[in-house]
Amino acid sequence: NKPIHLRAKAGIGYLSQQRSVFAISVYDNLLGICQLCIKGTSNQIKMTEQLLDEFNLQHLRDIHASNLSGGEVRRLMLARLLINKPSIVLLDEPMAALDPIVVQEIQKYILKLQNFGCAVLITDHQVNNLFDIVDRAYVLGEQSIIAQGTTAEILKSSKAIELYFGPSYRA
């Protein structure tokens, strides 16, 4: 129940399912957060440029964020998330409303979060989008954990199949 700024200071980053970018350029979306979190103008610019490169946003740097596609917005949001150097990142439906090609792209960027030293926790209703990128999964239902383990273990869980995937699900 802590306010967002205290969660950020505690090393927790959060990516909302909703579009959450400022109505300014891609570059300024990143630089603005850098100015709040990083000391020194040269360090702020360096981090902004690094994130533009790392998340393939360099060609969009001067584009107004409201003109970005869903996948481009997700990449910008993921990049912004890293500015405060969180140790834990919470992603809420990070691939919601994205087409299959963009989902694959976002999966690669989610995997990159580990390169920044982040533990990643993802909530998503479309678990098929996650099976290739997670080490462990938990299926929740009936107000408790109904299955947990590796992807293979989850797919063998009769309770997960019955209550979440449905009887016609084929792995």
Sequence positions of predicted segments:
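Catalytic Walker B motif of ABC-type/P-loop ATPase nucleotide-binding domains
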Residues: 89-93
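ABC ATPase NBD coupling module
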Residues: 1-18, 24, 154-158
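Conserved ABC ATPase signature
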Residues: 64-68, 72
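ABC-type ATPase nucleotide-binding domains, specifically the catalytic core motifs of the NBD
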Residues: 2-4, 26-43, 54, 167-168
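Conserved ABC ATPase "signature" region
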Residues: 42-60, 108-111
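Conserved catalytic motifs of ABC-family nucleotide-binding domains
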Residues: 85
